Amino acid sequence: MTKLKRTIAVIGEGITEKYYLKSLQGIIKADIKPIIPNHATSMFDLEKQIKKAIEEGYNNIFCLIDMDNKKQGRNRDNYLKLKKSYHDKRIYRPKKGLDTYIRFFENERCLEIWFYFYFKITTKEYLSSDELCKELEVYGYKKTEDFFKSCQGLHRFLESQGGNLDFAIKNAEDSIKSKDRDGRDYTYSEMADFFKSIERK
């Protein structure tokens, strides 16, 4: 029988998620294992990682989803199909000792909108992730692995530049409320729900 682990598997789509999750050590109580698929935009790879985490006995699997490449066409269709299969679902296999809850958390355009919410709220539509990242440059942010390695932790860096996690959570909540109210499908983050799903210290 598989023994359930207390760790949470968090599946991101790239190195930004990997380094941000690592930077949360000491901020949250949960023991998080970041998982990054080989091909960031592949729904096949994402599903493969979800299935692997289920079989490894994680009782919570959280997927951080960048929406910038899932807005239309086949990418959108494949994502919606995957989301329908796994989002907000419980996988219960008592014979294997498996009891797993899976949830997706979307960021539009990408995780950087969550970083922006550390500082400000916005409903501006960004036409590309690069456009959004450029707005973060005023705070010294760079979307490069060299920067992620040298900034002494993304969360700590964002707060050192005047950002605030509680402010980001409030802004993310407001972004969802205004999205639903206005019928908007852009510039929002579900990371407030992510932090509600894990315990902060």
Indicate where each model-derived feature is located:
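C-terminal accessory helical subdomains adjacent to catalytic cores in phosphodiester-
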Residues: M1-K5, K18-I36, E47-N60, M67-K201
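Conserved beta-strand elements of the Class I
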Residues: T7-I11
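Conserved helicase motor
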Residues: N38-A40
